[in-house]
Design a protein with these regions (language model features):
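PDZ-domain C-terminal substructure recognizer with occasional recognition of PDZ-binding tails
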Residues: 132-175
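Active-site scaffold of zinc-dependent metalloenzymes
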Residues: 82-100, 115-118, 174-207
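Short helix/loop segments within enzyme catalytic domains
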Residues: 32-61, 159-162, 238-287
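PDZ/PDZ-like peptide-tail recognition elements
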Residues: 32-95, 168-170, 184
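Bacterial N-terminal signal peptides
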Residues: 12-24
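Conserved PDZ fold ligand-binding element
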Residues: 105-133
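Pan-zinc metallopeptidase signature
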Residues: 281-310
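Catalytic Zn2+-binding segment of zinc metalloproteases
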Residues: 201-202, 209-211, 218-234, 264
């Protein structure tokens, strides 16, 4: 899948926040806060991405603390609905939309609806919400939280149902490759050197095994350092030559290994490639090996897979 410059993905990431609740205008029409359930595209991407990162620590050259949090803030929304969102969700700091089961956040007792107001006893500095919806505030908070976790546990000051409490988030490392859900009616995915992203259409169409390979393939591009130059797409038209094709082979091999280590079946990779080949047949050959060759290589990699191997 194509490597996109980081700023391009970050400009689009805010949409994943609104997708988690439905469109903001729909969300505020409800009588009670709406949170994504476990089978929503948002939580599936977050959960599968967490498992891939957590279960492949030994295969990644660079690690960072994982939280298992799906977050939002007022800056994530259009200015026209921010007041309603603040009232409906009690949102003044950084809000918790979802928590990945079994994650550090889940073990800390964090819940959807919690509003994070402080770190280690110090209030979070507010980020001025801009004239348009933006992911900047969440990205800044996530980076700050990860940096603090690098030094050990972090005490979070949280408002829950109008009452303050303190929860302790422990450091739990995994691959330094974050995941994101982007809008899009076409099944597609990208990586930009930091994020592995899939479209809403892909997340809705793919089963867990297929989505595990799609995210694993994109995370592999991040882990292998492929963002230095553009390379071909798993689903779309690529622009590279022989070197790009080799990088796609590398990402397939590492991606299926990562997905197997996280508990997803190799058959999902085959189904995904078949499906995407039918949807994007005109562009795959520019940077990708043939689908049959890719599936054969994936089967070979899966046959040699050992959970303990690095």
């Amino acid at each position: 899948m194509p490597v996109r410059e980081s700023f391009t993905l970050r400009k689009r990431l805010y949409v994943a926040i609104s997708l988690a609740l439905g469109q903001p205008s729909v969300a505020v029409a409800q009588d009670a806060p709406q949170f994504p359930d476990a089978r929503s595209p948002q939580m599936r991407v977050a959960t599968i991405g967490y498992r891939l990162a957590a279960m492949n620590r030994q295969r990644c050259p660079r690690l960072e603390p994982l939280t298992g949090l799906l977050l939002h803030d007022l800056g994530s929304y259009d200015p026209a609905v921010r007041q309603q969102i603040a009232s409906r969700y009690g949102l003044a700091g950084v809000g918790v939309l979802g928590v990945v089961p079994g994650s550090a956040a889940a073990d800390a007792g964090l819940r959807p609806g919690d509003d994070i107001r402080g770190l280690d006893g110090k209030p979070i500095a507010p980020v001025n919400a801009g004239p348009t919806a933006s992911y900047d505030g969440i990205a800044l908070f996530t980076d700050m939280l990860v940096q603090r976790l690098m030094h050990g546990e972090v005490a979070l000051t949280v408002m829950r149902a109008g009452e303050p409490l303190t929860v302790t988030l422990l450091r739990r490392d995994g691959c330094a490759a974050r995941v994101a859900l982007l809008p899009g009616r076409k099944p597609d995915a990208w990586s930009d050197g930091r994020y592995a992203a899939v479209t809403q259409a892909l997340a809705e169409a793919a089963g867990d095994d297929e989505l595990g390979f799609a995210l694993g393939h994109e995370m592999a591009h991040v882990v292998l350092g492929h963002a230095a130059e553009p390379h071909g797409a798993l689903t779309g038209i690529g622009i590279g030559g022989k070197r790009s094709r080799e990088r796609e082979r590398e990402a397939d091999r590492r991606g299926v290994t990562m997905s197997l280590a996280a508990g997803y079946r190799e058959a999902g990779a085959e189904r995904l490639l078949d499906r995407l080949a039918n949807a994007h047949a005109s562009g795959l050959s520019l940077t990708h090996p043939s689908v049959r060759a890719r599936i054969a290589a994936i089967r070979e990699t899966a046959a040699a897979f050992s959970p303990e191997a690095r």
